[in-house]
Regions:
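Short, low-complexity disordered leader/linker segments with a strong preference
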Residues: 1-36, 110-115, 321-326
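Hinge/cleft segment of the Venus flytrap/periplasmic-binding protein
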Residues: 22, 33-35, 165, 169, ...
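Extracytoplasmic "Venus flytrap"
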Residues: 34-56, 60-82, 86, 98-103, ...
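Short, solvent-exposed amphipathic alpha-helices that sit
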Residues: 48-63, 67, 144-148, 172-190, ...
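Short beta-strand elements at the ligand-binding edges of bilobed clamshell
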Residues: 70-73, 128-151, 165-166, 195, ...
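Hydrophobic alpha-helical segments within soluble ligand-binding/sensing domains
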Residues: 80, 136-162, 176, 204-206, ...
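Hydrophobic alpha-helical
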Residues: 81, 85-89, 97-114, 181, ...
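Flexible loop/hinge segments that line or gate small-molecule binding clefts
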Residues: 104-143, 161, 258-266
Length: 326
């Protein structure tokens, strides 16, 4: 299955690259007067968060708003790197990147800089020096993890036997959301029942939780690094007749705040959901327009304001205001 997904994402990247065509560098598309932009993102099918994120960028980076934008998608670093290098070769004015992995971008960023292509980060940070990109409009993934784990500690459970479902390994979201929980495992305050990547997938998460249930290993917390994996975990619990949510056998924690996930909190089927804002496009747009007018970004790093939601206090107004999708 993983091989098929890799092939599919490779096809998506290749299709996007071939669709880009020849573009000219230096203040916009010479024939149309539009600013040329290459957007590299995870595929919308990855999660409800990513669907909202992709929709946000496609709504902002339009011809009507002064852009000739091309999009490439993959959750695989090597495939994103191919797309990045092709955008540089094609001479776009800007590359906007939500990186699949934090490491390995330095040389590509330097090549873009030499070619006069400006790079913006969105959603996720990378480990490259900040001098190699214009600015980053991102979530503080480490703080998301700390907020979630602090909430969990405040529940004062008699014991913490945790199934930890990680996102794609090496991504900023995975690293940040894992770090705070790892600190608790390392201190002995919480017990690691299993810690395994579910690759943001409900199906993979369901299989992991099912294997723990089949083994008869006791657990009372599922910490899933996105909503889709939490949903898959809950499906495994339901199939086995294990109760979950407020006052039940297993505490359920997710991230992203899809509307359907917040409704699960409201119904007290889940316990916690951490917000991760997908709306960075308008901020990046404003920075690009400033650069086009000779004004450098005022800030190198802009962090989205985010919070966590508790099933005992969430309201319908919270769902309406903060929930993603329908």
């Amino acid at each position: 299955m993983k091989k098929l997904l890799t092939i599919f994402f490779a096809f998506c990247v290749a299709s996007a690259i071939f669709a880009i065509g020849d573009q000219q560098r230096g203040g916009g598309n010479a024939s149309s007067g539009l600013i040329t932009v290459g957007v590299i993102n995870n595929p919308p099918s990855e999660s409800g968060y990513r669907t909202a994120n992709d929709k946000d960028f496609k709504a902002v980076f339009t011809a009507a708003n002064g852009y000739d934008a091309s999009f490439a998608y993959s959750i695989v670093f090597e495939e994103q790197l191919v797309a990045f290098n092709q955008f540089v070769t094609n001479g776009v004015d800007y590359i906007l990147l939500s990186a699949a992995a934090t490491d390995g971008w330095d040389d590509a960023f330097r090549a873009a800089q030499r070619a006069g292509v400006k790079v913006f980060l969105f959603d996720r940070m990378v480990s490259a020096p900040s001098s190699l990109y214009e600015a980053a409009v991102v979530s503080d993934m480490a703080q998301e993890g700390k907020t979630a784990v602090n909430w969990l500690k405040d529940q004062r459970l008699g014991e913490y036997n945790v199934i930890h479902l990680q996102g794609v390994m090496g991504s900023d979201a995975q690293i940040g959301r894992t770090a705070a929980l790892d600190a608790e495992f390392n201190s002995g305050a919480m017990k690691k029942v299993v810690q395994q990547t579910g690759n943001w997938s409900a199906d993979e998460a369901k299989a992991i939780v099912q294997s723990v249930i089949n083994a008869g290993t006791p657990f009372n917390v599922i910490y899933a690094e996105n909503d889709d994996m939490a949903k898959g975990a809950v499906a495994a619990l339901d199939a086995a007749g294990v109760t979950h949510g407020v006052g039940k056998d297993v505490v359920i924690m997710g991230f992203d705040c899809n509307k359907w996930a917040l409704r699960e909190l409201f119904a007290k089927n889940w316990n916690y959901d951490g917000q991760c804002s997908p709306f960075q496009a308008s901020v990046v747009d404003g920075m690009i327009k400033g650069i086009q007018n000779g004004k450098a970004p005022a800030q190198k790093k802009i962090i989205s304001e985010e919070k966590g939601f508790d099933a005992r206090t969430i309201t319908q107004a919270d769902i309406d205001q903060y929930g993603l999708g329908e």
